[in-house]
């Protein structure tokens, strides 16, 4: 009997949030007797799956340069994608699991022209909105709704993936035709929030399911041995990238308002950002050291996530698993991670609301045990990612 084969495609492998999700899905598949491959564009950590590198640095730089001028993200890297397709035909996967196929490493037109001719089952997890727009990965920052009918004159032309010329109308039509033509496509949404958008997009007639992301509860757990100064209330913020959309400016403003009784730590800053942080804001560069992150989550009295554009942030789940309550903006699927016993939702951009929530959290702390219980009930990676494998088994 042929061993079932899973091939996942993502920009990273076991690196960053989507890369770690792919790694966990691969591990779960292997535990159920599957052979697992992960094809990736750049940045990886060691993996239990077979890794396939797509292209090289020159491919990436050429893709980036062409996209910056012509607005054709995902339509370059032709040679690299042809080589990937050759490998796909050799390993003959039963399921191709897509994650982020944008970010300068893959040609989605070539990939889908190939997949659409095969009987391979395709499962695509929506980590952002790029799949069903003509350009952007998150349209909520501009309140744009053109993606519901036909993208044109993109108001986010200067945002990722930034470009000189606007061809959002052509991109939208091409995506609609290519992705819509695949009769073996199943859509996974990480949150109810993004699922509702998919149901309004040109993918609305596809099978759409919601599977929340999960975290490793054996890794992300409270470090009880930590000794903290309880005279100082610890506020933590973590992100892979810090920019305006992630709430970096709001973090700076928050630091100006809070007194010295509150210590703020921000993880994931660049060297340049680190050197420009105001006094009283502790900066830590992006780290792949999980134990360091666990220690920071466990030390914190509250975790804040002032994001303006997000789907279902893994950092919220990691904080809860470490017993730390979450304060988040009402953005995307971020509020779905918490309930009234484990966090507070603040209206987007309301820095004073963040301050008030932090004050309340200090005066009347939420239960660390309740945070952990919610993580165990809803976001155990083994339970969450097992749902992917159950789906694969049904599809084949």
What are these regions (language model features)?
Residues 268-294:
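Nucleotide-activated donor-binding/catalytic signature segment of Leloir-type glycosyltransferases, i.e.
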Residues 325-328:
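Short hydrophobic beta-strand element within catalytic cores of glycosyltransferases
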Residues 308:
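Aromatic "clamp/platform" in nucleotide-sugar-dependent glycosyltransferases that forms part
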Residues 188, 227-246, 252-256:
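Conserved donor-binding/catalytic core segment of Leloir-type glycosyltransferases
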Residues 340-351, 359-365:
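Conserved acidic donor-binding segment of nucleotide-sugar-dependent glycosyltransferases
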Residues 5, 366-390, 394:
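A short, well-ordered alpha-helix in the C-terminal region of glycosyltransferases
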Residues 295-300:
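Short alpha-helical donor nucleotide-sugar binding micro-motif in glycosyltransferases
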Residues 193, 214:
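Carbohydrate-associated surface elements
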